[in-house]
A protein has these predicted regions:
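Serine-hydrolase catalytic machinery in alpha/beta-hydrolase-like enzymes
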Residues: 1, 6-98
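Active-site nucleophile loop of the alpha/beta-hydrolase fold
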Residues: 28-29, 127-135, 155-157
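Residue in the alpha/beta-hydrolase core beta-strand immediately N-terminal to the catalytic nucleophile
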Residues: 102, 124-126
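Gly/Ala-rich beta-loop-alpha elbow adjacent to hydrolase catalytic centers
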Residues: 104-113
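Short alpha-helix in the alpha/beta-hydrolase fold that links the catalytic acid
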Residues: 138-140, 148, 161-171, 193
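Short beta-strand/loop motif that positions the catalytic acidic residue
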Residues: 146-147, 151-154, 158
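Catalytic histidine-centered segment of alpha/beta-hydrolase-like enzymes
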Residues: 160, 184-196
Length: 216
């Protein structure tokens, strides 16, 4: 439950054996169909626990629906969602008792990650297709002065922010590890890109789990 007393819908996918690391997923914008079942995150939950021992935590931000249900509240354009991110991080540490937590944001979720996942217990951030529509410069300055790893994967053909534009947008955050992905688009459609992104997540969280199998 959030501090403004909203109940959020979520799911936790946990390995049968040892947990190598935990991953909290912040989904794309629900106004464009984003939710906790957005395909990269759904496939991460289905695969990474067994393949790499990574625990995957997904949830719907306020007012967002998926097959599992609808989170209470209403979409708040990335403002009230700060409470959702805080509640999810607290849940990970206080209820799940995670030891190492990374936060991954995709599209709208990257703005949520940068702006609201500053909790010192978070080990690092992964940004997928960052549009940089809601993150002010002072937030980038915060992360520039922070020692935790932040990695951004920017599709070559992203219609919101391509690699060349990303270099300019992130110029006040030179510490960022910005990785352009040739041939990719904003939504990472296609199994080759899914496997690539899941492999990159594993590389950051649990490199001993590489290479990921093509099938399980």
């Amino acid at each position: 439950m959030t501090s403004d007393e909203l109940t959020l819908v979520g799911e936790v996918a946990t390995p049968l054996g040892e947990i190598t690391a935990s991953l909290l997923c912040l989904h794309p914008n629900p106004t464009g169909g984003g939710m906790m079942d957005s395909h990269i995150f759904k496939k991460a939950a289905n695969r990474l626990p067994a393949m790499a021992g990574i625990q995957v935590i997904r949830f719907n931000t306020r007012g967002t629906s998926s097959e599992a249900g609808t989170s209470e509240g209403a979409y708040d354009h990335g403002v009230g969602e700060s409470e959702d991110v805080t509640a999810a991080i607290n849940y990970c540490f206080e209820t799940l008792k995670v030891k190492t937590l990374w936060v991954v944001g995709w599209s709208f979720g990257t703005d949520l990650a940068l702006c609201y996942a500053k909790d010192p217990r978070v080990a690092g951030l992964i940004l997928l297709s960052p549009p940089m529509q809601r993150t002010p410069d002072n937030v980038l300055e915060f992360w520039q002065n922070d020692s935790r790893p932040v990695v951004a994967y920017v599709p070559e053909h992203d219609e919101y922010l391509n690699p060349e534009q990303a270099v300019e947008r992130f110029k006040i955050f030179p510490r960022l590890n910005l990785i352009p992905i040739p041939g990719a688009k904003h939504l990472w459609v296609g199994e080759p890109f899914v496997h690539l992104i899941l492999s990159e997540i594993t590389k950051q969280l649990a490199p001993q789990g590489l290479p990921l199998p093509i099938e399980i």
